[in-house]
Amino acid sequence: MAKRYGKPIFPGAFTPTEILTAWEAGADIVKIFPADSVGPNYLKAIHAPLPQIKLMPVGGVNIENCGEFIKAGAAAITAASCIAPKKDIAAGNWDAITGYARQMLANVKAARNK
């Protein structure tokens, strides 16, 4: 149904079989969750025999490790709490949140340029 209306499909998967099944079913990108339990090397291992599958780690991606996930073959990353911590939202600390986002973006760009 989503494809009919031109909407992207990002199902979650974990095992290689689930990842391939999601891709063959029409996923645009397959979310790997929870990414922090397997790390960037897992994405690299999946991406080696299945380079056509776009992977997006979710869960545990942060400013420090986002570049490693990109280098391992992630097409995109998903991060929330590390960019916008509840304490900073509650305090209205928008400059800090902007800084976190800028740092993550810089780390992703640096990883893609290597």
Language-model regions, residue ranges each:
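Glycine-rich phosphate-binding active-site loops on the catalytic face of alpha/beta enzymes
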Residues: 32-40, 72-94
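Glycine-rich beta-to-alpha transition loops that act as phosphate-gripper elements at the mouths
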Residues: 11-16, 35-37, 56-63
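Short beta-strand/loop segments at the ligand-binding rim of alpha/beta enzyme cores
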Residues: 1-10, 49-56
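Catalytic cores of alpha/beta
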Residues: 17-25, 42, 61-77
